[in-house]
């Protein structure tokens, strides 16, 4: 189980980034309004301000793997985005397997087919819940540049 701290969870998509945060003790997970994507340079100031306002100490990024645990077409994009964001924000990061997280969030919250971003942020909240229960520990981005690493939560429900 990771050390509790204020963390921002991201469910990175091509059009939106679902966001969720937790309190510094890791007790309460809260979905945050999804970010409608632009270029990375447009997203960064919004995420910087959010991290500053919430006193974020680490990032949890969903990594889309298939049912066999293999990277999907979207996984490479998420890896690049997560690393780039962690480096820009100078925050440690952990990856969580997001297989089925969007489906599970849709089922749990009745948000199937939602395009407002609520579904994306509900999925980010599920990822953060899973990370708080199972880890892995946050790592400096420099330690993750070679790949997603062996420490990956096999989450998603």
UniProtKB/Swiss-Prot annotation:
Q: Which InterPro entries match?
A: RNaseH-like_sf (IPR012337), YqgF (IPR005227), YqgF/RNaseH-like_dom (IPR006641), YqgF/RNaseH-like_dom_sf (IPR037027)
**Could you say which protein family the record assigns here?**
Belongs to the YqgF nuclease family.
Q: What class of enzyme is it?
A: hydrolase
CC annotations in GO: cytosol
Q: Which CDD domains match?
A: YqgF
Residues annotated as coiled-coil are none
GO BP, sorted A to Z: rRNA 5'-end processing
Could you tell me which Pfam families the record lists for this protein? Answer: RuvX
Task: Identify the Gene3D superfamilies for this entry.
Answer: YqgF/RNase H-like domain (3.30.420.140)
* E.C. number: 3.1.-.-
Keywords assigned by UniProt, alphabetized: Cytoplasm, Hydrolase, Nuclease, Ribosome biogenesis
Q: Which domain of life is it from?
A: Bacteria
Query: According to its UniProt record, where is this protein located?
Result: Cytoplasm
Q: Name one GO molecular function term.
A: nuclease activity
SUPFAM superfamilies, per database record: Ribonuclease H-like
Q: Principal place where this protein is found?
A: cytoplasm
Q: What protein am I looking at?
A: Putative pre-16S rRNA nuclease
Q: What's this protein's function?
A: Could be a nuclease involved in processing of the 5'-end of pre-16S rRNA.
Q: What HAMAP family is this protein classified in?
A: Nuclease_YqgF
